[in-house]
From Swiss-Prot:
Protein's GO biological process: DNA-templated transcription
Single GO molecular function: DNA binding
Name the record gives this protein: DNA-directed RNA polymerase subunit beta
Quaternary structure and interacting proteins, as annotated: The RNAP catalytic core consists of 2 alpha, 1 beta, 1 beta' and 1 omega subunit. When a sigma factor is associated with the core the holoenzyme is formed, which can initiate transcription.
Entries under PANTHER family matching the protein: DNA-DIRECTED RNA POLYMERASE I SUBUNIT 2
HAMAP family attached to this UniProt entry: RNApol_bact_RpoB
Ribonucleoprotein among keywords: no
Gene from which the chain derives: rpoB
Highest taxon of the lineage: Bacteria
Enzyme Commission numbers on file: 2.7.7.6
Protein family: Belongs to the RNA polymerase beta chain family.
Species of the source: Burkholderia lata (strain ATCC 17760 / DSM 23089 / LMG 22485 / NCIMB 9086 / R18194 / 383)
Primary role: DNA-dependent RNA polymerase catalyzes the transcription of DNA into RNA using the four ribonucleoside triphosphates as substrates.
Cellular-component GO terms for this entry: DNA-directed RNA polymerase complex
Keywords: DNA-directed RNA polymerase, Nucleotidyltransferase, Transcription, Transferase
Amino acid sequence: MQYSFTEKKRIRKSFAKRPIVHQVPFLLATQLESFSTFLQADVLAAQRKPEGLQAAFTSVFPIVSHNGFARLEFVSYALSAPAFNIKECQQRGLTYCSALRAKVRLVILDKESPNKPVVKEVKEQEVYMGEMPLMTPTGSFVINGTERVIVSQLHRSPGVFFEHDKGKTHSSGKLLFSARIIPYRGSWLDFEFDPKDILYFRVDRRRKMPVTILLKAIGLTPEQILANFFVFDNFTLMDEGAQLEFVPERLRGEVARFDITDRDGKVIVQKDKRINAKHIRDLEAAKTKFISVPEDYLLGRVLAKNVVDGDTGEVIASANDEVTESVLEKLREAGIKDIQTLYTNDLDQGPYISSTLRVDETTDRTAARIAIYRMMRPGEPPTEEAVEALFNRLFYSEEAYDLSKVGRMKFNRRVSRDEITGPMTLQDDDILATIKILVELRNGKGEVDDIDHLGNRRVRCVGELAENQFRAGLVRVERAVKERLGQAESENLMPHDLINSKPISSAIREFFGSSQLSQFMDQTNPLSEITHKRRVSALGPGGLTRERAGFEVRDVHPTHYGRVCPIETPEGPNIGLINSLALYAHLNEYGFLETPYRKVVDSKVTDQIDYLSAIEEGRYMIAQANAAIDENGQLIDELVSSREAGETMMVTPDRIQYMDVAPSQIVSVAASLIPFLEHDDANRALMGSNMQRQAVPCLRPEKPVVGTGIERTCAVDSGTTVQAFRGGVVDYVDAGRIVIRVNDDEAVAGEVGVDIYNLIKYTRSNQNTNINQRPIVKMGDKVSRGDVLADGASTDLGELALGQNMLIAFMPWNGYNFEDSILISEKVVADDRYTSIHIEELNVVARDTKLGPEEITRDISNLAEVQLGRLDESGIVYIGAEVEAGDVLVGKVTPKGETQLTPEEKLLRAIFGEKASDVKDTSLRVPSGMSGTVIDVQVFTREGIQRDKRAQQIIDDELKRYRLDLNDQLRIVEGDAFQRLARMLVGKVANGGPKKLAKGTKIDQAYLEDLDHYHWFDIRLADDEAAAQLEAIKNSIEEKRHQFDLAFEEKRKKLTQGDELPPGVLKMVKVYLAVKRRLQPGDKMAGRHGNKGVVSKIVPIEDMPYMADGRPADVVLNPLGVPSRMNVGQVLEVHLGWAAKGLGWRIGEMLQRQAKIEEMRVFLTKIYNDSGRQEDLESFTDEEILELAKNLREGVPFATPVFDGATEEEMGKMLDLAFPDDIAEQLGMNPSKNQVRLYDGRTGEMFERRVTLGYMHYLKLHHLVDDKMHARSTGPYSLVTQQPLGGKAQFGGQRFGEMEVWALEAYGASYVLQEMLTVKSDDVNGRTKVYENLVKGDHVIDAGMPESFNVLVKEIRSLGIDIDLDRN
């Protein structure tokens, strides 16, 4: 088994019973693949597939002018390299994007050419099409300096859907069937039955019309319509009565209205008897061809065809007319014998289309189209061209209607056609096929569709959403281009004169900047990033709205299995509308979610893995991943638990066709991180999944001792860690960068064999948490491609580490853990276990005002030197300064208008020429309730404005850092080159050289070492080939130097050019403060099982309950939090965590007494290979075993995968191994070793009962009391009511509401009440009066009229009622 460099340092013992069949796919693949398909940036223009940008361009181009003599054709597009890299964009507040240029060709035809068109001239040119945001390697976008994510959308797939109203519309509870054809873009077409069984259609939810109007509009006559939907009965008229052609099926179940006889006149069915199968057999046996029917049997039947008098050509009766006595009379007169009527019955052949034809008043195709025109454009006169154009545009024009590849596939599958491709617009037979199925449904044949089935909902990813926006922009451009194309020839225009890129840029900018699906990335920790990118939302444009979404849409559906997580979804109004992709889910070419299954052939599980969509899955019998199989892959059990079409059942192995790949396949990333998930209630698991995303990265991340084995995948795929791009040797490492000398076999010829990784240091995330990377390799380490070189936020040795492992005791403690409160030891705070660093960004801008420019300066009047003490000469705070609320960070003055001066001021001015009062102090200060350390300052200056010293110094530092990188690369390149050179030169014969090298001398190592490296090139060699090689190496080194100099120059140019700032801004300063947040009462904490609580008290270490060996518990939780919540997973985690730590202590004890390596190996083998997944410890060297043991001292990390975790027996074994009987006895453990005797820290007495004690991975959540605590003295007031504002952000007050007033009234506290409602709130004069009185030392309240009363009076007056206050 292969272990990576980091895995060897600390192996996670897995309890999984099943081998890994299928690796978890790259977790951000959906986003990255979708966007790369959209851009196709690295594909040659000629080889691009018709998708993404290419599809958008080809669908709009060529654009032809109105007269048809000029057209603009699309040739290809290209994306330039981005001007700034990701980091620079974040710092400068820019969008990380690249310029999109399209090569277009303007073709002008010769108007004079008499016959076929002749090309007169062709102009080709590259045209700028706007900026296209680029995706970062981690699947996000940088828009205006902030990272955003485009969330995928789950929407109803295009195609045709059949449903009924579940009997809700009509009072009788009758099912009304309907069908809807949904295109990808274009008009929706609905068909629906009304309670009277008449079939209507409507376009885009407008007024409904009989469906036969649509059928006539597509060119069918009433005869053809009836022929399409009915079978006919054939009658031959006799002088009296008629003969009916006998069709057995049509008679079965009917009641005979007359005696039915055979040819000989023998009665087979008596009148008023129901015709059964025996009667039919008798009739068939008698070879009955016709049945004689009486006259009244014909009456009321409906004619299928027009009946025309052969001699006169007169229409006697039309199709769909009822047969009456007069009609029969006319027919006999005209000598017509054969007539056809519609066969209908009440059971499975309803007369719906026939009834609809009767309601329809239109007569022919034109009238039908006019009726549709009137419905679509009421009030407009229907001219012939307009009517035709509108109808064709509705469903037949490719510009206006697009069913899309998916829609066509879904449509054809639903109407049972074999081929899944076809035209992208609606065809006449599509409309007919839909109506036929709908009528069949009404007749009781077939099933309606389930719209929540994942086969009917598809995912639109970034690429597709961006393509739709881009196409919308292009269509806007198309209209403008059409106008101008007419003038292209006369005014000699070039392509760039025709195309204006503004509409495209604005469409793209709007989508990425403010669409509902473009969201501010949740960056609290690596898990929240991954989850955000894997989110699937049913909301957004073209999706559902919160208010309208019912229970069904939100509910878990059987087809979610392995595609969408049934657990992870937000609590609240969005529940079930926002979901997360399951671990192995993947999108197929049509955008439907697929999940992998192992193929089973003859009850033997093969290694073949097939991805099945929800529709395909319904056809197979699928076994669960935990079905027992032997070593040959044969299913052992007589009955296997399996699923077919969403139903679970027990079946014999020979019926199984597929099997799940992994037990964790049904849940999402966050849910699969919860150990013992199978023992938690689903509601609590949902909270646990959601709260892990809110865990704040701790100062020192600590791996969970009980994990699920997916922690490493999460950390690596999130992009928080640094991975080796190529293998090699670590050449240099410090806190800020890692330099790797690449292996020769991985280095590319002519390229620097050096990889430099600059680590991210103390950077602010979107949620103000700290992102910081720490190297975990040492100089000289050999690393392979993909190894973890540095840990990021919330990762420990390349594993996700969201919280800390706490020693937890389940017991009550003086009521301090009442109602989920948490009691914590002071030691936890003192050790900085939950201390987190938060980085705040504070901005100040100097603008150009009407009165003159604002100035950033240290020279501010009326400020004491103490307040300016932390500013440098430019007026900007030093890095490293510790600041409190109200301290000045950046000094800034703003000019203010001339004010009326007092005589004293005039005198002072005359004497001293004092001009200071022209400016007011608008410095940037630390906001209230914040304090911290300044860790970074950035200064941005507009082009053409003198930089201050500080800005210059920042640029110099940046260049120095860059030069260091380049020097390192050069050092390694030269080192390699000179090593190769030395190997080549030693032993060669020289013709001369420096230090008087004689001709014919053999060069040796000593001579070379004596020379300066660069003088080696002056040696003249006798061997011409070697001399040429020497020259080549010299050239390659010089070439590299030249390249590095160019790169440095490029960087310098980028840094020294002015910054792009918003209009009117001259200078902008950003100050970054690092705020250290210790754990304190009021902070919210949680485990991974939805067991959340608030810290109630931090107890001195000596008061905490402690074990017999003196070790105190870290956290005391209430045992009552477990039973009713049904999240027993937390108790199991505590037991297993206790074993993990116990094993760690035993390993630590071995290391302390310097036990033999062999003893260590035996013990580690016992831990790793007695149960669960086997580890290959044989391949480890003694040094590696020693390093592994050192890392295991703090606890042997366990993995208990979801639904495949540790059993009770295995946990017992581990506890026995961790706590031998002597230790167990000393600690007073129970026989199963999961409960311990504890002593009260305050009295030293032993508690009456043993206590469940162990280690749990506990998180601190991003709901910190510091961010929520707030107190107001005097602050802003609302403009109209003059009442204080509310909320911390507005520095608002506390609302004193209706009920609080009642409380004071109840106590009769009249003065308190008066004060609350007047001077403390909105009595403007009273407020100032109280202030004056307080200054004078007089504590009297003069309450006046509250402003809200005046507002009330004004509002009543606005109703036209004259109301006035009688002040007497």
